[in-house]
A protein has these predicted regions:
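Topology signature of small-to-medium multi-pass alpha-helical membrane proteins
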Residues: 1-140
Length: 140
């Protein structure tokens, strides 16, 4: 990944690497949940929410690969995935889950939300870095 990003500012490279690692971690989590649960990891969730979480087994690695390749589509997909994941986790942990107080899911939701906000803060820099590469590749 570093070769494609070597001309980007250090902070932007760090944000890109961190986002790729978060997306890779998300991929592992969703694949493990799918494997351990025998194909139905979220039986208590509404169908639309189960479908969304299952789709992350494809969307997380796709966003990571596109972002690692310094593609603007990777930035857009990573933002869409992480922001929607924060919203979906909020729904699952605060609307669907009737438990009062702190739960592991609610702590996880808070962490996903912090990561999504961090990515939103980094998005302008990531966007500029991917735009400059796009301009360079069209001039060749």
């Amino acid at each position: 990944m570093t070769g494609r990003w070597e001309t980007a500012p250090r902070a932007v490279r760090a944000a890109a690497v961190a986002t790729v690692l978060v997306l890779a971690y998300g991929t592992v989590v969703h694949v493990v949940q799918l494997a351990v649960a025998g194909g139905d990891p979220y039986p208590d969730l509404p169908g639309w929410l189960r479908t969304y979480f299952l789709s992350l087994t494809v969307l997380d690695p796709l966003a990571a690969l596109l972002l690692a390749g310094r593609r603007r589509s990777g930035v857009v997909l990573a933002v869409a995935v992480l922001v929607s994941d924060a919203v979906a986790n909020g729904w699952a942990n605060h609307v669907v889950d009737p438990t009062d107080g702190f739960t592991a899911g609610r702590v996880g939701h808070g962490l996903v939300t912090l990561v999504a906000v961090g990515l939103l803060v980094a998005t302008p820099g990531l966007g500029r870095a991917t735009a400059s590469l796009s301009r360079l590749s069209t001039r060749r």
